């Protein structure tokens, strides 16, 4: 009898533990209001609902400050969260994430280590001092201008990387981009802006072999990497 009573008392605790912790009320309101995410139509997001969702979360300009809970969306393919007040973002559990747009926030920390499928990162107009993309070997588009970057190491990126767009401009403290074992000339770079930076095989030495890059715009692409009509610069 006592054993059966103990099991019954534990059931509410077990049930509560199945809900995703989403402390930001604006983010939670968005998720609960999405029928493809909140499939049972209640007022919570269950872990099972988050785990099985394999679409896009689009929460632009919603006054969100915290994306805690995103880690349960392990099959999430795209995350668009620009124009918010997000300071930290951890996508290390989002192993299926291919596109991340987090520009126009207040990001000081961006963890991409587990997002091994990431192809496009758009993180301009933030406060990032460091950016580690060493595990994101599928990147084809990297735009992180207007941050506070002091270093950017692309050394672990495969030489087969098909980068077609990159912009590191307006990072006043970023002088060198380390590219050991990366040859930009073996890629298909269509747009690259390194107005205030140079490439080097060793950013820590005073005797630096500088590499220049042809900044001519070969094609104009949209945020999804698709070629669009535009004027090429000369």
Model regions and ranges:
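Short, intrinsically disordered, charge-balanced linker/junction segments flanking boundaries
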Residues: 226, 231-234
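Conserved hydrophobic beta-strand positions in leucine-rich repeat
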Residues: 55-59, 79-81, 98-102, 119-123, ...
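Residue-level detector of functionally pivotal "anchor" positions at catalytic/ligand-binding pockets or at interdomain
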Residues: 200-227
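Conserved hydrophobic position(s) of the canonical leucine-rich repeat
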Residues: 53-54, 76, 86, 97, ...
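N-terminal capping/linker segments that flank leucine-rich repeat
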Residues: 4-78, 95, 116, 154-159, ...
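Consensus "Asn ladder" position of solenoid repeat domains
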Residues: 62, 84, 105, 126, ...
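Extracellular, beta-strand-rich repeat scaffolds characterized by small/acidic residue-biased motifs
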Residues: 71, 83, 93-95, 104, ...
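Canonical leucine-rich repeat
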Residues: 67-70, 89, 110, 131, ...
């Amino acid at each position: 009898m006592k054993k059966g009573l103990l099991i019954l008392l534990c059931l509410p605790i077990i049930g509560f533990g199945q809900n995703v912790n989403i402390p930001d009320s604006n983010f939670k309101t968005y998720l609960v209001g999405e029928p493809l995410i909140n499939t049972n139509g209640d007022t919570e997001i269950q872990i099972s609902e988050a785990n099985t969702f394999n679409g896009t979360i689009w929460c632009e300009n919603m006054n969100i400050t915290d994306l805690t809970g995103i880690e349960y969306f392990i099959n999430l393919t795209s995350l668009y969260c620009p124009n918010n007040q997000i300071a930290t973002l951890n996508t290390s559990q989002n192993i299926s994430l291919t596109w991340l747009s987090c520009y126009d926030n207040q990001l000081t920390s961006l963890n991409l280590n587990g997002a091994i499928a990431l192809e496009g990162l758009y993180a301009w107009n933030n406060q990032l001092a460091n950016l580690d993309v060493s595990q994101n070997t599928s990147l084809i588009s990297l735009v992180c201008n207007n941050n506070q970057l002091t270093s950017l190491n692309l050394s672990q990126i495969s030489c087969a990387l098909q980068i077609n767009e990159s912009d590191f401009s307006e990072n006043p403290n970023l002088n060198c981009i380390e590219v050991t074992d990366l040859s930009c000339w073996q890629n298909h770079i269509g747009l690259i802006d390194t107005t205030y930076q140079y490439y080097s095989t060793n950013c820590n030495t005073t005797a630096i072999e500088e590499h220049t890059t042809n900044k001519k715009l070969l094609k104009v692409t949209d945020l999804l990497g698709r070629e669009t009509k535009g004027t090429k610069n000369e």
